[in-house]
Amino acid sequence: MTFSIENNKQVVLGEELGKLSDNERLKTQSNFLRGTIEQDLQDRITGGFTADNFQLIRFHGMYQQDDRDIRNERAKQKLEPLHNVMLRARMPGGIITPKQWLAIDKFATEHSLYGSIRLTTRQTFQFHGVLKPNIKLMHQTLNSIGIDSIATAGDVNRNVLCTTNPVESELHQEAYEWAKKISEHLLPKTKAYAEIWLDGEKVETTEDDEPILGKTYLPRKFKTTVVIPPQNDVDVHANDLNFVAIAEKGKLIGFNVLVGGGLAMTHGDTSTYPRRADDFGYIPLEKTLDVAAAVVTTQRDWGNRSNRKNAKTKYTLDRVGTDVFKAEVEKRAGIKFEVSRPYEFTERGDRIGWVEGIDGKHHLTLFIENGRLLDYPGKPLKTGVAEIAKIHKGDFRMTANQNLIVAGVSKSNKAKIEKLAREHGLMDEGVSEQRKNAMACVAFPTCPLAMAEAERFLPQFVTDVEGILDKHGLDKEDNIILRVTGCPNGCGRAMLAEIGLVGKAPGRYNLHLGGNRGGTRVPKMYKENITDKQILEEIDQLVGRWANERLPNECFGDFTVRVGIIEEVIISKRDFYA
């Protein structure tokens, strides 16, 4: 036995990791994720959930939040915070039909505090500001259109991402089908979701079984992608498990498997760090689900259940050794990884505007700044997408860059859809390449973990950066992958950007430099805890040097490493804080 839990302590490969964290107690006592959520739903005295259920609802795809803009004012009035939930839907590969879209649009308008639909870096949508009396209605509305939110949060395999490649339609369809299969294979098997939210028939707990995830589920969240090179729109190095599509003559034949990526860290704790995924090798298609389960169960058994800050797969690999972890996966899956097939990641951005697929269908990628679909003055974006949904015969594809593709448009419908998009501000040639390559997480006012602004901060910040690029005579193609995340948990994927800002306190950020265009290098901290004004001053100086000293076609991140402005991070555990 390579692992054991005795006397509330965890031992892995002979090493005692310590006393189990309280989250392990919570999961053990939850009766396969049921807890006392149903009782909490009946309690109308508070808008929130009790301590254990506050954590357990995450496994059902929700986070308890409140409006931090009004928290202090409510406290003065002797009121509890305005508790509500954010829901993240499970949409493997980000594909949603027009009928489904119209239903989620209606729910967001009628039953959420903010009336918005938020496209996220997890290639799905979120509802924000849903009050307790509307939570069950939300789940039942989604269920009626074939959507759920099972395992989009919590210590489970989360929404499976897939490259949105509308041009190579057949290859994308194959990759998407695998994303769906992986999602279903790794999904929790408990009936708790149906019982609580869909008024499903109660079953005896002895019928529950979790053959892959186990009774206490995973040590920490787990993220999986299917990616089609050379596009790295899903950011493989932000994820625990990645299947890199290998094709011959446009047909999918197998995957290279990358394991152990992840971006979250904790300020001031050098045992935490962002990390690139390791390439385990190539597998044929028929071994995909076996390998997925083997990686997940190895992490289930070997991951740190004592210290949640060191519980993710990336730390397990660094603790036990990549070769040891890989050998265990091979043993459990009954395979030997072959040598990786050649591939390269060159870009991550979405191709905004129209493209024609090899199947003759047209696809329109709409740039949605920060993924927030709402009706703004003069730009009724949310209404615009709903109007398109009313006439669109194909599907919509949410991207991991928080944009939206109107996919599978016939030639006869193309002009009508473009007209609607332009009328509602969804197509705008005035949007710069720099803005298209910038991204932020939600942060304030709804995220309880945010230390600084991100989504509300980014638009003006990008305008300021655009001014700096213009000042130094750079062309519109000379843009920088720029990302802002409101806290070190990394939802905005700033730790794979050429310029990454990580929130430290209100109005203050850590400035990281040195990522690259393809998302294959972790940036390093350049300045700590500085204001946005100071950040812009630093960027001004750095961009000035880049404009004058760069090599032909040298991107900003590569330049900062080459000239020694920042040291390259090769092995994160060794280099990130060095």
From Swiss-Prot:
Cofactor: siroheme; [4Fe-4S] cluster
UniProt pathway annotation: Sulfur metabolism; hydrogen sulfide biosynthesis; hydrogen sulfide from sulfite (NADPH route): step 1/1
The keyword Iron-sulfur belongs to this UniProt entry's keyword annotation: yes
Keyword match GTP-binding: no
Biological-process GO terms, alphabetical: cysteine biosynthetic process; hydrogen sulfide biosynthetic process; sulfate assimilation
Any GO MF annotation of the entry: sulfite reductase (NADPH) activity
Binding site for siroheme: 491
Family: Belongs to the nitrite and sulfite reductase 4Fe-4S domain family.
Protein name: Sulfite reductase [NADPH] hemoprotein beta-component
Native species: Vibrio vulnificus (strain CMCP6)
Gene (UniProt): cysI
